[in-house]
């Protein structure tokens, strides 16, 4: 097996995964619409499409890890391109959350008469920001410190220490997700309670979804670190996970300050 390539550029091999992923996305979209309108077979098609997407994600990323770790395809130029890619991806995620913050501030800065011309809307009992939300803020910031600890350990060649740091990060992420679930269960309002409920659950819910994705990302990095895939000079997979996790931290700080603290007063 070749362990290097004669050029520094990112040229991918022929792969069936883009086609399979596209078919999975098509099936899940059509199946989702059919399921929402109670058509026969909609749920089955939706599950099939989601299964295809999950399988594609697994095998495609498996191939990327093989190309990077065992075949030497990720040269400096390729890694630079991947860094630009993850940065642009995070910028697109910023735009995604910007829509939710825009909806929240549009509604809260100039509340309409339909909601009592006040914010929070009349009849809404808000959550105490200094309870679970503040605790979750401390937990998520601690997880950000732990992932930074893991990064420095990898740079220093301390394999075991990096594994421990990633375990701590994943543990804190799971605790955060658990507390978020408890908060949702005990919330005195629902997503159907007007603009406050919809913006609250959409913004915090999508953030929670990103936390789950980031947790899976970090678990994979922990396994790879345990297997010795990362070196002080070659660990972009971990760097991408760390970039993503710090983005999740920053979004939560904005959510806490704007929706929980300012928006709840």
UniProtKB/Swiss-Prot annotation:
The chain crosses the membrane at residues 16-36, 41-61, 85-105, 138-158, 162-182, 200-220, 242-262. PROSITE patterns: COX3. Component of the cytochrome c oxidase (complex IV, CIV), a multisubunit enzyme composed of a catalytic core of 3 subunits and several supernumerary subunits. The complex exists as a monomer or a dimer and forms supercomplexes (SCs) in the inner mitochondrial membrane with ubiquinol-cytochrome c oxidoreductase (cytochrome b-c1 complex, complex III, CIII). It is a multi-pass membrane protein. Belongs to the cytochrome c oxidase subunit 3 family. Component of the cytochrome c oxidase, the last enzyme in the mitochondrial electron transport chain which drives oxidative phosphorylation. The respiratory chain contains 3 multisubunit complexes succinate dehydrogenase (complex II, CII), ubiquinol-cytochrome c oxidoreductase (cytochrome b-c1 complex, complex III, CIII) and cytochrome c oxidase (complex IV, CIV), that cooperate to transfer electrons derived from NADH and succinate to molecular oxygen, creating an electrochemical gradient over the inner membrane that drives transmembrane transport and the ATP synthase. It is an enzyme of class 7 (translocase). Keywords: Membrane, Mitochondrion, Mitochondrion inner membrane, Translocase, Transmembrane, Transmembrane helix. It is found in: Mitochondrion inner membrane. Its EC number is 7.1.1.9. It catalyses: 4 Fe(II)-[cytochrome c] + O2 + 8 H(+)(in) = 4 Fe(III)-[cytochrome c] + 2 H2O + 4 H(+)(out). The keyword Translocase applies. SUPFAM superfamilies: Cytochrome c oxidase subunit III-like. The keyword Membrane applies. One of its GO terms (molecular function) is cytochrome-c oxidase activity. GO terms for biological process: aerobic electron transport chain. This is Cytochrome c oxidase subunit 3. InterPro entries: Cyt_c/ubiquinol_Oxase_su3, Cyt_c_oxase_su3_dom, Cyt_c_oxidase-like_su3, Cyt_c_oxidase_su3-like_sf, Cyt_c_oxidase_su3_a-hlx. GO terms for cellular component: mitochondrial inner membrane. Pfam families: COX3 (PF00510).
